[in-house]
Regions:
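Conserved phosphate-binding elements of NTP-dependent enzyme cores
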Residues: 1-941
Length: 941
């Protein structure tokens, strides 16, 4: 097998006949500016070919389920192993999928509880045991040899027989004596009396003395087995002469309850055996939503925290509750979020002093909604019920998804539900300290190894704040990718090609080092790891770097530099530089060698106005007060899970939007919002969602440049002659578009059992328009030619012919580093980072926009150092127009350029949720708490 993956003549997208040799079993970073061709090389060439060859090696039966994969456009690729792509996308939309099921940790937990879990009675708390013949023998051995005892079996009449009839059958089977009414009696003597047999009757199966010889043990075991059979699973030992008895049962029962023997399906919420019967394993049902009943937990019961108890008439419920609550010392003036679980239970389910004979004393939230249900024949009560209904935790399983029997099974005092609700960092500590009995430890050894390894992998990629019951569809793209990475590590595949797309997204600098170790582990077990990445730490930790460029689009697609990382410092003079190329062409090497850098601002912008959030309590936020300065760039930092998104996306954005009268989802829990809110007239969350709901949406239509282009073509002489208006040059309206493909340029053929086929339209050949429309030209270019231009090409073309209005609308796209994308490129093909920057370009192009707060969530996703510089210039342009920028970010190049930093932490999950430091980068870097300061100091000084 070759030591290299050899690519010859790669021509996918903008790649320019690339020849490349990539070392196998190494950690390789592919880098370059946005649009340079990195993804074309990594995913559209390497992954596509590796996956295609693997699929072709399968049987024809297996291939029919996987669909046909096209061969990437290149001369040949040699030495490529089976490829696995781990991309930035949410891996599952299945509402049943969790972090535990995705990483397979939950499967091991199920097996662990099925094998070594011990069942405890919910009534007495005693362990429930199912006895065997061996248990009986072991107990007998505790007595000294020669001790006399009797093995008894309870008389269990067969259905339809009386006790007397059953005794006759026992007599026929060879049994002679019974234990009845406190004495041993012969069966025939009891039957001769003719009296009705009542009370407990035990058949004497055998009379023995403790004998530990082989024959003695064999006889004891045979007799015990017979007793279990005759007694329908029950057996009693009676020792002489004390008459002390001990009961044994092969039935799994205690306290009058028959329990289910633990098995792995019992702990599966995807199996009808283990799933809660009420919610079918989803954990949620449609019911009374606590967040709607108590929308503001900062209020007390007295102040009206229970929304349905407000108003002139319904307010009587609050008054009655407050009056009766005094008996139980319920704190009616305490904010709801400070109430103990016990006090919350009283409010919802009833006071402990409630008297069923006094209806007023039973007032509580449950009673209120019971009253509403009884009056639903009235429209106002039906409306009220609808107002407070929503998805809420299942009342039967309390959101655990499992039936109650699963929680009776415990290991070291914990049920499986307890474990999946722990943050992974806490769960890892619990497993590290677990003490099991010797027998259980031997059975669980392999399972514990797998669980501990997978938990450690999750910690290594910086996701220790997650819980195993966290839904997969609530994870960010970066979190999903890293969860997928840990799954790959846990599977221990070797000889594969792993291709990752920016695994450092959403990762604080503190966690990058641990991520690097994970990537190296993947390499060390015998895999080739290729990472498309811009993070400097990961680049320097790689074995080999491939720099694609030098620029984007048609100015990219070449290998500017490749070589071992150790050659980087002297790259300018290295013989490994590609001929006819130089260090000056590689933006990556310029930054890595210090020749170029993102400069620090000469000064930090001062501010005197702010928006202030008080008492933020959403998720893990600890009731914090935070001020966001206006007309400056504020960066919210902190490790993953520290509360950044909860503060900014969960509270600031919706609260501010509602305050200025715009429709928005309900914000998370907080006390109040104040400050200079009137200075903000609009708030915009610039996310990474597609710029349009339709695949027809493209950058030119989004920034309104296409309207001007259509007007230009409608003004051409041939258009005037033919009567073509601007509408004829739209692919969204009838007239000039190709009606065969409806202006899409492609036709989608739905396949019944395979992936849909997307074929070029045979009528317009992908041009989107009718032939007579394509005859209209502006300086030699028809409308289809213009849509195929990149932003850079279009600006150059329209500038040459003085179409300044079009240039003005396209210029912001170039300013934010998107000069390489095509005007007509479908929004569905843009990455999240590209979508975000198209939106940013739109706002930059708006001249008369009112004072706005722009909120960005990791805008540097997918950006090279060179592109970040352009992005910061765009931010400065918005601020200079009187706008405010708030950014959630981990990238130190952006953080060091902030005017104001809000550092959250100090850690993730329960250990986060506080404000660690605020102020300028210089002020924050001097803080000794949290993790941001340490890394920021290295960038500032």
């Amino acid at each position: 097998m070759s030591n290299y993956i050899e690519i010859k003549g790669a021509r996918v997208n903008n790649l320019k006949n690339v020849d490349l040799k990539i070392p196998r079993n190494k950690l390789v970073v592919i880098t370059g500016v946005s649009g340079s061709g990195k993804s074309s090389l990594a995913f559209d060439t390497l992954y596509a070919e590796g996956q295609r060859r693997y699929v072709e090696s399968l049987s024809s039966y297996a291939r029919q389920f996987l669909g046909r994969m096209n061969k990437p456009e290149c001369d040949y690729i040699k030495g490529i192993p089976p490829a696995i792509a781990i991309e930035q996308k949410v891996i599952s939309r299945n509402p049943r999928s969790t972090v535990g099921t995705t990483t397979e940790i939950y499967e091991y937990l199920r097996l662990l509880f099925a094998r070594v879990g011990h069942t405890f009675s919910p009534i007495s708390g005693n362990e429930v045991k199912k006895h065997t013949v061996e248990d009986v023998l072991a107990f007998v051995k505790t007595y000294s040899e020669g001790t006399k005892f009797v093995i008894l079996a309870p008389l269990v009449p067969v259905e339809g027989r009386t006790e007397a009839e059953q005794l006759k059958m026992s007599l026929l089977q060879g049994y002679a004596r019974i234990y009845y009414k406190g004495d041993f009696q012969r069966i025939d003597d009891v039957l001769e009396t003719g009296e009705e047999i009542t009370g407990e009757v035990y058949i004497v199966v055998d009379r023995l003395s403790v004998d530990l010889s082989t024959d003695g043990i064999s006889r004891m075991m045979d007799s015990a087995e017979t007793a279990f059979y005759e007694g329908r699973g029950e057996c009693r030992l009676m020792f002489m002469p004390s008459m002390i008895t001990y009961d044994f049962s092969t039935r799994f029962e205690a306290d009058g309850i028959e329990f289910e023997v633990p098995n792995d399906n019992m702990f599966s919420f995807n199996s009808p055996v283990g799933a809660c019967p009420e919610c079918q394993g989803y954990g949620k049902v449609i019911g009374i939503d606590p967040s709607r009943v108590i929308p503001d937990s900062g209020k007390s019961v007295y102040d009206g925290c229970v929304a349905c108890w407000n108003g002139a008439k319904l307010g009587e419920w609050r008054e009655v509750f407050c009056r009766y609550a005094a008996k139980d010392n319920f704190p009616i003036f305490e904010p709801y979020y400070k109430l103990s679980e016990e006090h919350r239970s009283w409010l919802w389910h009833g006071l402990p002093s409630a008297d069923p004979t006094d209806p007023y004393s039973t007032v509580c939230i449950d009673e209120f909604f019971e009253m509403v249900r009884q009056n639903q024949y009235k429209i106002q009560y039906r409306v009220m019920m609808a107002r407070y209904r929503g998805k809420t935790d299942c009342p039967t399983c309390h959101g655990t998804r499992l039936k109650k029997e699963a929680n009776y099974v415990k290991i070291a005092g914990r049920s499986i539900t307890d474990l999946v609700q722990m943050p992974i960092v806490t769960l890892k500590e619990w497993f590290a300290n677990i003490q099991l009995p010797e027998h259980d430890a031997a059975i669980a050894k392999r399972l514990l190894t797998e669980i501990n390894n997978r938990l450690q992998f999750i910690l290594d990629v910086g996701l220790g704040y997650l819980t195993l019951n966290r839904l997969s569809n609530t994870l960010s793209g970066g979190e999903s990718q890293r969860i997928n990475l840990t799954t790959s590590l846990g599977s221990s595949l070797v000889g594969s090609l792993y291709i990752l797309d920016e695994p450092s997204i959403g990762l604080h600098s503190r966690d990058t080092e641990r991520l690097i170790n994970v990537l190296k582990q993947l390499r060390d077990i015998g895999n080739t790891v290729i990472v498309v990445e811009h993070d400097e730490e990961i680049m320097r930790a790689a074995d080999y770097i491939i720099d694609v460029g030098p620029n984007a689009g048609r100015l990219g697609g070449e290998i500017v530099w490749q070589g071992e990382t150790k050659n980087l410092p002297s790259a300018a003079n290295s013989s490994s530089l590609i001929p006819n190329s130089s260090l000056s062409q590689s933006h990556t090497l310029k930054y890595l060698t210090g020749e170029d850098a993102i400069p620090l601002p000469k000064s930090r912008r001062p501010w005197n106005m702010k928006v202030e959030i008080k008492g933020a309590r959403m998720n893990n936020l600890k009731g914090i007060d935070v001020a966001f300065p206006l007309n400056v760039m504020t960066v919210v930092t902190g490790v993953s899970g520290s509360g950044k998104s909860s503060l900014v996306k969960g509270i600031l954005y919706p609260a501010l939007k509602r305050h200025i009268g715009e429709v928005c989802d309900a914000p998370g829990e907080y006390g109040s919002i104040g400050g200079d809110i009137k200075a903000i007239q609009h708030v915009e969350f610039v996310d990474q969602n597609p710029i349009g709901k339709s695949t027809r949406s493209n950058p030119a239509t989004y920034v309104k440049a296409y309207d001007a282009i259509r007007e230009l073509y409608a003004d051409q002489p041939l258009s005037n002659q033919m009567g073509f208006t601007a509408q004829y040059f739209s692919f969204n309206a009838e007239g000039g578009r190709c009606e065969e493909c409806k202006g899409a340029g492609v036709i989608t053929v739905e396949m019944q059992f395979m992936a849909d086929l997307v074929l070029e339209c045979e009528h317009c050949h992908g041009k989107r328009f009718k032939s007579d429309i394509l005859e209209v030209r502006f300086h030699g270019k028809n409308i289809s030619d213009v849509l195929d231009m990149t932003i850079d090409e279009a600006i150059e073309f329209f500038t040459q012919w003085e179409q300044l209005d079009i240039v003005k609308r396209l210029q912001p796209l170039q300013d934010v580093g998107l000069g390489y994308i095509r005007l007509g490129q479908s929004s569905s093909t843009l990455s999240g980072g590209e979508n975000q920057r198209v939106k940013l370009a739109y706002f930059i192009g708006q001249e008369k926009i009112v004072p706005t707060m722009f909120i960005f969530d990791e805008p540097t996703t997918g950006l090279h150092f060179h592109d970040i510089k352009k992005l910061l210039e765009s931010f400065n342009a918005l601020i200079s127009r009187g706008h405010t920028i708030v950014i959630i970010e981990h990238n130190l190049e952006v953080i060091k350029c902030a005017d104001h930093i809000i550092d959250m932490g100090p850690d993730g999950g329960d250990r986060g949720g506080n404000v660690v430091a605020v102020g300028t980068p210089e002020m924050v870097s001097g803080c000794n708490e949290g993790f941001t300061a340490k890394y920021l100091r290295e960038k500032l000084y």
